């Protein structure tokens, strides 16, 4: 699907920005898969499994939150990114990512109140999630990432 989106955007004249922005959905998928795999490996440890599944779920919120943010900022009649309109700058992904992370913050606050501190899974996996969200901004514009997208689009 990402390869099709890149090709569609390139036909509309937005190839570079589409290639750069494609790091967002791909890192979301990879982080989700890795977190779910870790959760499945810890199924016999319910406290770890549950929290990894929460972090995995939070990692998927970015696209939904981005649609709401775009609707608020651009209005209802504006053309949607990825549907013939220019893809947004990659830095735009930070706002919906961090807004989605508020669900994780709420879970950490719940742990803090119930256990006296947040569970280490929330701290470690949450920090990894934020690192991925922040690092994809500079990495998306690199020649190495664009080479990956060329391979994906084939």
Describe each model-derived feature in a short phrase.
Residues 1-154:
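Alpha-helical membrane insertion/targeting regions
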